A protein has these predicted regions:
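Conserved non-catalytic scaffold segment of RNase H-like nuclease domains
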Residues: 1-114
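Short, flexible loop segments at boundaries between secondary-structure elements
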Residues: 116-119
Length: 119
């Protein structure tokens, strides 16, 4: 079985306040063993990082300014996770942001039934 362990960092805690993803990191596992396939991107959120989020991840607006946008990496991210079970700690948080980003660009959302939450 192929799985992807996924984590995100964001500009804040809520998509209702239009916070965005600033980092996506994934590793692929086959039968729980890393395959050395990795997806990692820092993202330009096109909005300021909140002070609280900066204290968590340390990514400044200046650092993120020249990074790709979610729109620019969406297809490669979709291809990386496609058909794989996704493992996320606190999945509700990460999925709310990932699916918010997908809605903004009219892409299908990640189906919760394909996700294992470690929380």
């Amino acid at each position: 079985m192929i799985e992807v362990v996924l984590d995100t960092e964001t500009t804040g805690l809520s998509t209702t306040q239009k916070h965005r993803i600033v980092e996506i990191g994934c590793i692929e596992l086959e039968n729980q063993i890393p395959t050395n396939k990795v997806f990692h991107e820092y993202l330009n959120p096109q909005r300021p990082v909140s002070e609280e989020a900066y204290k968590v991840h340390g990514y400044s607006d200046e650092f993120l300014a020249d990074k790709k946008t979610f729109t620019e990496i969406a297809e490669s991210f979709i291809n990386f996770i496609d058909g794989k079970r996704i493992i996320i700690h606190n999945a509700d948080f990460d999925l709310s942001f990932l699916n918010y980003e997908f809605r903004l660009i009219n892409k299908p959302e990640i189906n919760r039934k394909n996700v294992i939450d470690t929380l």
